[in-house]
Amino acid sequence: MQYKNLGRSGLRVSQLSYGAWVTFGNQLDVKEAKALLQACRDAGVNFFDNAEVYANGRAEEIMGQAMRDLGWRRSDVVVSTKLFWGGQGPNDKGLSRKHIVEGLRGSLKRLDMDYVDVVYCHRPDATTPVEETVRAMNWVIDHGMAFYWGTSEWSAQQITEAWSVANRLDLVGPIVEQPEYNLFSRHKVESEFLPLYSTYGLGLTTWSPLASGVLTGKYAKGNIPADSRFALENYKNLANRSLVDDTLRKVNGLKPIASELGVSLAQLAIAWCASNPNVSSVITGATKENQIVENMKALDVIPLLTPEVVDKIEAVVQSKPKRTESYR
């Protein structure tokens, strides 16, 4: 396992990490979670991602209990959570000072931890002034509830505004963004965010490297495995949007490239994400130990991604974003 600095910070995170979205509390209980988390640690993973909204908070409870039962030292792992959707009350969501402070307290209680290493704004909040959010994030850092803060699914303009406020007030800005990034979703990471990497030292912890499992190659039109994410009732709409003919055609076109390299399609897709130098960590998800073992082998695939192989991939997916023109 390789470890990279999270953006321009001194925090070191494993190049591949594990996230609790969909899995903990939806498909897995504590016993199963313990087995998966230990498989991750055995592979060298030190970064684990969560959110207050995952399984309505149950995902945090399961992760915290599993880590306690496994007897892990808190200082050996990096744990993050995300705040935005906390509950049904008018102040239980968004990025107000009230919800950031109370929401993080709730997350820490569920995790049974004194702090998280990174706390994210799970989405931008158009109803709260950015200055209030920046000040609130600095407050939880100053009070030892978190060490760093970041954003998730924010635009480059929104991140820039947060940094401008932080610099003006001599406060800490967001060191990391968590965007979707895979062979079918590339614009933000490869185009929109380009100025942010050098200007603010922005790090990335990217999610959905397998495009919700589409890039495993296990899905075909009208064929959804019963134990897969798309078989869950809440993900039927996502399945309908994802399993379109053009996407499935491209997936089938990638399979021979993976076969030539002697690797699985999933390993090829994860390695492709991890090979981007601006990506600090690729967040993976799995419901079975063997999936984790196979996913971690993606690290061995990165050296195989020669310019010739990358060109073959590009010829199939045809998803490379055009560089944004600069008029400055």
Swiss-Prot record:
Q: Which InterPro entries match?
A: K_chnl_volt-dep_bsu_KCNAB-rel, NADP_OxRdtase_dom, NADP_OxRdtase_dom_sf
Let me know which tissues express this protein, per UniProt: Expressed in late-developed leaves with the highest expression in the flag leaf (at protein level).
Q: Which Pfam families match?
A: Aldo_ket_red
EC category: oxidoreductase
- GO cellular component: a single term: monoatomic ion channel complex
Q: Where does NADP(+) bind?
A: 21, 27, 49, 152, 178, 207-211, 218, 229, 285, 287, 291, 294-295
Please provide the Gene Ontology terms (biological process) for this protein: monoatomic ion transmembrane transport; potassium ion transport
**UniProt keyword annotation of Ligase present:** no
Keywords from UniProt, A to Z, are: Ion channel, Ion transport, NADP, Oxidoreductase, Potassium, Potassium transport, Transport, Voltage-gated channel
Query: Key word Cytoplasm present in the record?
Result: no
Gene3D superfamilies noted in UniProt: NADP-dependent oxidoreductase domain (3.20.20.100)
Conditions for induction: Down-regulated in late-developed leaves when grown on potassium-deficient soil (at protein level).
Q: Which domain of life is it from?
A: Eukaryota
- Gene Ontology molecular function terms on file: oxidoreductase activity
Q: Where is the active site?
A: Y54
Q: EC number(s) per UniProt?
A: 1.1.1.-
Instruction: Fetch the SUPFAM superfamilies from UniProt.
Output: NAD(P)-linked oxidoreductase (SSF51430)
Miscellaneous: In vitro, interacts with the N-terminal part of A.thaliana KAT1, a voltage-gated potassium channel alpha subunit.
Free-text function comment from the UniProt entry: Probable accessory potassium channel protein which modulates the activity of the pore-forming alpha subunit.
Its quaternary organisation is: Forms heteromultimeric complexes with potassium channel alpha subunits.
Q: Which family does it belong to?
A: Belongs to the shaker potassium channel beta subunit family.
Task: Supply the name of the protein.
Answer: Probable voltage-gated potassium channel subunit beta
- The organism encoding this protein is Oryza sativa subsp. japonica (Rice)
What are the leading ranks of the lineage?
Answer: Eukaryota, Viridiplantae, Streptophyta, Embryophyta, Tracheophyta
Q: Which gene encodes it?
A: KOB1
